[in-house]
């Protein structure tokens, strides 16, 4: 029999979404009545299938308030409740990266006096056993202080801090992210089964576990966990004395890396693994929207990412019952490991992200091409990432048309003689060139699609002309079509020109 309680995402110090009907939900005994009240509002429902959910009317920003939830025998009381803005922070390690580990993080923790940002960290565990539910009971919302905020998402914190200051309300962040995860890990089996390309993510797992006993798979995974713990200790030793060491040198010292481990039910790194255990543990908590930073792990299937990402957005909108739910996401920055060739797979992920922005309603894209670090997949400066997400939200969600949220974004191409002329959206204020080498990163090709490095000049009408001596009849242009390269071209607002290619059918 289910115990009478509210879902773990409800606790003292929580933030409820302003100016939207607010869902409050939990578990209980079938047939019993549940009454939820806060600041003069009351809602009543009856438990069915050991679950209950009430909807409170929209409320204006304010607080602190007290929420009471009663079944007639027990009363749950949550204090210090604020009504403001609530955003879910989804994605993988660059969203997960903690405030204590970002550039300047220790100073922010010591000196910030942020009273109007709060955080709920969704438990990271895909194994929904008795321990899962015991541990979940110990989760709860926290207010900012130098200790509790150490593990907050740095990106989400900087985003929320600016948003709270601008709107004058408390902002709550629901952290729902995990490093090394594919978008497919955060989706349901049903959503992936709808499409042949997406079903491949399920097939990876289904084929790996076919014909194997649970006992055998659990032992294999737990053996891996022990190995990985020792391997990580050795890797810290190695990089402390070889900061510029290569991956091959690291493995020669530590042994072969087995990350992310065998694909088993206990391993969170497989399709659907985090949907029930994380997404559905906080859904349908009423939120304003989603901020999202992910895509690195999906570079093994970059040509499928547009379809995968679009399906994730639609699934989450369906789950939250809001087909207009805002989705502000980060386009991947520059990145390449020193030992790797330029596979250009991140180019395809970035292109899929821009295509998502251009074709999926109520989305925003934070271009952070200039925020990458060579040989480091986790750039430490998260302030500009949070800031550019904030700009996107102000522009798309909060209706501030004066906010310059974009750098220039490719619009179209015409050809004049031996020059390709590129026009841009969001380029009314013009361009800035940074560095001593002028504009770099453009390439041009003829009908043969053999790209050559190109010169680029800014025209008086705000277009950019691109040309190369070897290409007399330009047919295609691409810009910063590389996993890692110098970023020299920006809008006047300091946001870089987004990477592009003029033909998505060009596979070379």
Describe the residue ranges of each PLM region.
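Cell-envelope and extracellular/periplasmic
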Residues: 1-508
């Amino acid at each position: 029999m289910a115990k009478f309680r509210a879902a773990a995402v409800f606790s003292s110090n929580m933030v409820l979404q302003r100016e939207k009907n607010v869902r409050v939900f939990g578990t209980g005994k079938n047939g019993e009545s549940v009454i939820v009240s806060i600041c003069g509002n009351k809602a009543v429902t009856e438990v069915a299938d050991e679950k209950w959910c009430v909807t409170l009317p929209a409320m204006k920003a304010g607080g602190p308030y007290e929420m009471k939830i009663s079944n007639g025998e027990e009363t749950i009381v949550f204090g210090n409740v604020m009504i403001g803005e609530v955003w879910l922070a989804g994605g993988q390690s660059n969203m997960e990266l903690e405030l204590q580990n970002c550039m300047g993080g220790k100073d922010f923790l010591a000196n910030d006096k942020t009273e109007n940002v709060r955080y709920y960290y969704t438990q990271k565990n895909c194994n929904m056993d008795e321990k899962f539910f015991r541990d979940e009971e110990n989760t709860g919302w926290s207010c900012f202080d130098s200790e509790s905020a150490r593990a907050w998402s740095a990106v989400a914190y900087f985003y929320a801090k600016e948003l709270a200051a601008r709107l004058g309300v408390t902002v709550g962040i629901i952290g729902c992210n995990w490093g090394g995860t594919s978008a497919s890990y955060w989706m349901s089996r049903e959503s992936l089964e709808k499409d042949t390309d997406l079903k491949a993510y399920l097939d990876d797992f289904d084929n790996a576990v076919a014909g194997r006993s649970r006992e055998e798979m659990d032992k294999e995974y737990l053996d891996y966990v022990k190995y990985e713990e020792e391997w990580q200790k050795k890797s810290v030793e190695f990089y402390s004395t070889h900061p510029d060491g290569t991956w091959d040198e690291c493995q020669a010292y530590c042994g072969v890396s087995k990350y992310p481990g065998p694909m088993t039910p206990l391993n969170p790194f497989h399709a659907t693994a985090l949907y029930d255990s994380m997404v559905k543990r906080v859904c349908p908590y009423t939120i304003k929207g989603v901020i999202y930073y992910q895509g690195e792990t999906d570079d093994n299937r970059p040509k499928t990412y547009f379809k995968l990402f679009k399906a994730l957005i639609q699934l989450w909108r369906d789950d939250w019952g809001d087909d207009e739910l805002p989705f502000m996401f980060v386009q991947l920055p520059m990145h390449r490991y020193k030992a790797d060739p330029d596979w250009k797979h991140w180019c395809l992920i970035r292109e899929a992200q821009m295509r998502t922005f251009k074709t999926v309603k109520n989305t925003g894209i934070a271009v952070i091409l200039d925020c990458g670090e060579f040989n480091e997949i986790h750039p430490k400066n998260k302030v500009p990432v949070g800031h550019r997400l904030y700009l996107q939200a102000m522009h798309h969600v909060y209706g501030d048309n004066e906010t310059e949220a974009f750098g220039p974004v490719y619009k179209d191409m015409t050809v004049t003689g031996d020059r390709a002329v590129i026009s841009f959206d969001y380029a009314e204020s013009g361009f800035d060139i940074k560095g001593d080498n002028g504009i770099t990163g453009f390439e041009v090709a003829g009908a043969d699609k053999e790209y050559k490095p190109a010169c680029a000049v800014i025209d008086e009408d705000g277009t950019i002309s691109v040309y190369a001596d070897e290409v007399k009849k330009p047919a295609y242009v691409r810009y910063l079509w590389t996993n890692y390269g110098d970023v020299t071209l920006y809008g006047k607002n300091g946001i870089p020109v987004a990477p592009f290619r003029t033909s998505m059918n060009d596979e070379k």
